[in-house]
Amino acid sequence: EILIGLVGSEMCIRDRLVLDQVTDPQNIGAIIRSCAAFDALALMVQDKNSPQESGAMLKAAAGTFELLPVCRVTNLSRAVEKLKKEGFWAVGMDGYAKNDVSALQKGGKLAVIMGSEGAGMRRLVEETCDLTVRLPINPEVESLNVSTAAAVVLYELNRK
């Protein structure tokens, strides 16, 4: 898998974003743009449940598609386990988590995992997480769009 080459890279001090069954190409394009803007190392998606490159995705990525490696993997849980063996902390985003995203230590090797807007992370993927965190949003608002949440998380991790 492409993952092996990227995991072994010396550039792995930056964060990765992992998407679990995010299927909207415009959301993925916007997430690619945010990853590029906030200097994430790579985006990882499951091959089977993620859209292929399309005009809608490229348009939403706004010229940043070539700036970010997109790793397509067969088994997301196993791929996250491989990242953990390479020293990454697997951090799942969960609106009901006790810990706030601002409590994460910056500068480490993080693999931030985000699930689909409807179902969130699948159980097996969530079980690979070392911890889960949430974005502190108004309790009257159920959630954010996944691409918006990704941008906020990447910004928070990129702050000095």
Model-derived features: where do they sit?
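Single conserved hydrophobic/aromatic residue that forms the stacking wall/gate
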Residues: 1-8, 12-13
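Hydrophobic, well-structured mid-protein blocks that either form specific transmembrane helices
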Residues: 14-62
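Short beta->alpha connector loops at strand-helix junctions that form conserved
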Residues: 20, 46-47, 68, 74, ...
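Amphipathic alpha-helical repeat scaffolds
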Residues: 23-31, 75, 144-149
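Structured adenosyl-cofactor binding patch, chiefly the S-adenosyl-L-methionine
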Residues: 36-37, 58-64, 123-160
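Short, conserved catalytic or interaction motifs in soluble domains
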Residues: 40, 95, 103, 137, ...
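Histidine/lysine/aspartate-rich catalytic loop segments that bind and position anionic ligands
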Residues: 41-99
